[in-house]
Amino acid sequence: MRKFTLILMLALMLIAPIGAEARTYVLSVGIADYEGDDMDLKRCGQDAIKFGEVMKTQTQDVVTITSRAATAENILAALNQICTRAGEGDRIVMFYSGHGAEGCIVSHDLKAVKYEDMMSLFLASKAKDIVCFFDACFSGTIAQDVKSTDKNIVFFLSSRPDEMSQEDASWVGAGYLTQALLKGLRGMADTDHNKQVTVIELFKYIYNDVTKRIEKRNAGAPDDRKVKQHPQLVCAKQNYDMVLAKW
């Protein structure tokens, strides 16, 4: 009896920390190669790979899908899988770089992956925190699909609902938002130097970085070639201090 009790106590000691520690599940999607020849982008697949690499410094639960593998079916299946795996208190992080349209992102097979469908999966999950980064044209339209919930919802969007999102293939992250995001998560956004990056720190860094690059790009350009891009944050103020990265 004593032997059984000792074994049980040891088992509980091993199990308890696993159940108590919140986990972060990451889905990183990037599409540069679309069906046909007219829709291809520059380095969105690399955007997803680089984001996945950065997130692997925070968690080992990272799934990356790029280009031809990023069909609508595969994207939703992968998202459903991590939403199902996530338990109470866990966090889901989704990154997307590629084409966007009103109310959706666009898969490799040129199908609409609707924001409302992704939101349904997020809300059905037991996860407490939902953090998304969308580097896509018209990504600001997702705001209308954010429902009232007790979950901590945080969306970083590359542009307003009526704006295009810019890219530059000479960068490590081609998308303007992605470039700023990667630098910010690596510590550039840590304004108080406490080795943690919070939601509001990261957004302020991204917004300033992107708008400065847009201003530089527009300098000297004719009016018909000037562009606009203003990153957006969809988030309750109570989540501004949520820690997204630490080292």
Q: Where are the predicted features?
A:
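Cysteine endopeptidase catalytic domains of the caspase/legumain-like
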Residues: T5-L6, M13, P17-W247
